[in-house]
């Protein structure tokens, strides 16, 4: 009886350690997935800022050039 209890306790111990290792790996995989999402959101934000910045500077450049042409021709 004592031998059977020992072996059952040993199997329970091995199963617990195995389950613990699986949970740690699963947690590490979930953490890596979160980083990818963060990078994805950051790159999306970066691309949007670049697009709006480029268009905004282009429009500001046009307005500035028109204003300078107006001043040069004294038509303002």
Swiss-Prot record:
Origin species: Sylvirana spinulosa (Fine-spined frog)
Keyword ATP-binding in record: no
Paired cysteines (S-S): 70-76
Protein name: Esculentin-2SN1
Purpose: Antimicrobial peptide. Active against some Gram-negative and a variety of Gram-positive bacterial strains. Not active against fungi. Shows very weak hemolytic activity against human erythrocytes.
Family according to the record: Belongs to the frog skin active peptide (FSAP) family. Esculentin subfamily.
Pfam families (UniProt xref): FSAP_sig_propep
Main location: secreted
Tissue specificity: Expressed by the skin glands.
One Gene Ontology cellular component: extracellular region
Places the protein is found: Secreted
């Amino acid at each position: 009886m004592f031998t059977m209890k020992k072996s059952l306790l040993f199997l329970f111990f091995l199963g617990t350690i195995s389950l613990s290792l699986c949970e740690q790996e699963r947690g590490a995989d979930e953490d890596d997935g979160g980083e990818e999402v963060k990078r994805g959101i950051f790159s999306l934000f970066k691309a949007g800022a670049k697009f709006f910045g480029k268009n905004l500077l282009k429009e500001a450049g046009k307005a500035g050039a028109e204003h300078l042409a107006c001043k040069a021709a004294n038509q303002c």
